[in-house]
Design a protein with these regions (language model features):
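Extended amphipathic alpha-helical interaction segments
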Residues: 1-186, 193-196, 215-216
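C-terminal non-catalytic accessory extensions
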Residues: 206-209
């Protein structure tokens, strides 16, 4: 990321919501909490709320994280490694470790909230759970119908994909707009409405609503 920023200083880097969630899940698995995540609805919902912090205004992320962390440790205090999970998310995505000295001062997180925050996109009605590249990769998987295609199948698949992309490009320059799949359009609208309620309800209620919509 640093090398990219140095090469393209005016570019704005925005992380993907899908990969933010995957990062949290990988840590859950690493800490041996996979079974609990799969079987305990309350724990699973709280874990998903961590990624839902991406829909909180950047300036409010740290405070919202503290509220969520307090709720998690209070509601499920007996879960082993829960503090490690929260510390991982805090130091990786919210803020670094507390600095010595008076007052509450923290070092920078590995990934500043600016880099993974999704709120502006949701407010503008372009909320996504995956990015464009992720969608293209999924399209290729559907096209090949296998994980390891033969060379000829791979070439024919690329030719077919090129034809589809060329047709889509021609439709775009002639003003023809392909409609979104209805269920995804409805989901984006629901996320946009939910984001609009921020500040009108308790932050935990807000995070749970976003977390639910992200996995329906």
């Amino acid at each position: 990321m640093g090398a990219f920023t140095a090469r393209f200083p005016s570019a704005r880097i925005t992380g993907c919501y899908f990969h933010l969630g995957q990062s949290v899940i990988r840590k859950v698995n690493e800490l041996g909490l996979k079974t609990l995540y799969e079987t305990d609805d309350a724990f699973r919902g709280n874990v998903r709320c961590l990624a839902a912090l991406s829909h909180v205004p950047v300036e409010d992320v740290a405070e919202a994280f503290e509220i969520l962390a307090d709720d998690i440790t209070t509601s499920i205090p007996a879960v082993e490694h829960i503090d490690e999970l929260l510390s991982y998310f805090e130091h990786t995505y919210v803020r670094g470790r507390r600095l010595r000295g008076r007052g509450e001062r923290y070092g920078p997180a590995i990934f500043h909230p600016d880099s993974w925050n999704q709120r502006n996109g949701a407010v503008d009605g372009i909320a996504r759970t995956t990015n464009i590249v992720e969608g293209w990769h999924h399209g290729l998987q559907v096209l090949f119908q296998c994980s390891h295609p033969t060379m000829w199948r791979f070439i024919r698949g690329l030719e077919s994909d090129c034809a589809q992309q060329r047709a889509s490009f021609m439709q775009g320059i002639t003003g023809i707009i392909q409609p979104s799949v209805r269920k995804y359009q409805r989901l984006r609208e629901r996320v946009t409405r939910a984001v609009g309620t921020y500040g009108q309800t308790h932050v935990l209620t807000y995070l749970r609503a976003i977390a639910h919509l992200s996995y329906v």
